[in-house]
Amino acid sequence: MEKPNNTITDVLEGIVTEILVRLPLRSISRFKSVSQTWKSAIESVYFRRLFVSLHQNTSSSWSLLLRKEEFIDFHGCGTWGLPKSLGSYIQCMELDGKFEYMWFSGSNGLILMHRKLGTWKNYVGNPVLQQWVEIPACPGSYTFFCGVVTGVDEVGVVLSFKVVKSGNMFLNKGEMYMPLYVYSSETGFWIHKEVVCPVRLPNFYDPISLNGTLYFSQRGDSYNRRPGLMVLDFYGKPKDCHFIPLPDHALNRNKTCLATSSGFVMYIKTLAQPGGNLLKVWRLIDDSAWQLMWEVSIPFIGCYAPMSMHPFDRNIVYLWSHDNCYLMSFNLQTQNYKIFGDESKHHDCYINHRTCEKHMYKISRPYSVSEYEGPIILQQWVLSRWMQSVPRPPEVEMIDTTSLLSLVVKNEE
């Protein structure tokens, strides 16, 4: 990292930089309008890397959602300093006037939205910065979205994104093939390829996007004897689509969920059983094997369903009490817990108890062995650690609406 030159002007600029870099991103964004010099300084690689380095131990804002409904939100972090929940930025989103858009997938602060009615326009963007890139129509017929993945640099700044769609599967020489259409922000074009699919009837709902890879939860059925994850990597080494069974599986009433934490896909399971109730947590290693991280005896865990994990702290798991209808965070290392009650008492977070109660009963209700529906998956919308503009293809115009950070972000040339 280069240091400023030792001149009076550079020393003064260095002092200003040292002050600004310790502010939250919401405050820093306002100083970009002071002058072109300040704007250039804030958008420099030096400033960005210094900010990320100083805030590396601070959580970024994040939220748990199901479609556009928000369950829980932590927006009062030091990185962004947002005044309200992340979900409220999606609710305020206005594109194409009155048309309603639906959340489909998210990765590193970017989300993929598609319009419910009329022409099927689709956008990838950042609702907080209010920047959007329109995705052109896919050349394939009868396609549907799989998700969005992102490519990042060494400090987690988003450099590019890819939108993935799939077509109708077909049988060839005894193997099932899946057509894939991939749109890249680096080229502005769709490419088509076909991969051998290890799952005969794949599920593409509620994808998990992490490290340039899409993970799709697959239920156990007559074709897939064990539930697991179908994995598609779009930024790593070229691989065919492959399947990973979930660990320690049995078709029973034990509640499970899938989430991400500290850069890993995590699998959480509660076991209500004679002789002791357990909470078990695994992480996925190299997209090939599960590693058991925690096995904790918790007497009261039988009436709880796992919801998710903290995206930056792999010791924190979030549980929902069916009996008492409240949210609880549990620290696996210290075994301390916190019950979230009246949301008015939490100034830096938002808990939507009505949404939690309605949907958690529906998606984790008691079921019989024959009705096994797989792990709970809630979308973790996590803002990146820097307010970089949404990557856009060459010659494609950025759509900028009024920024909810009190800043109109203009296209970068």
UniProtKB/Swiss-Prot annotation:
Signal sequence coordinates: none
Keywords of the record: Kelch repeat
SUPFAM superfamilies recorded: F-box domain
Domain F-box: 5-54
Placement of Kelch repeats on the sequence: 168-210
Pfam families according to UniProt: b-prop_At3g26010-like, F-box
Protein's recorded name: Putative F-box/kelch-repeat protein At4g22430
Annotated source species: Arabidopsis thaliana
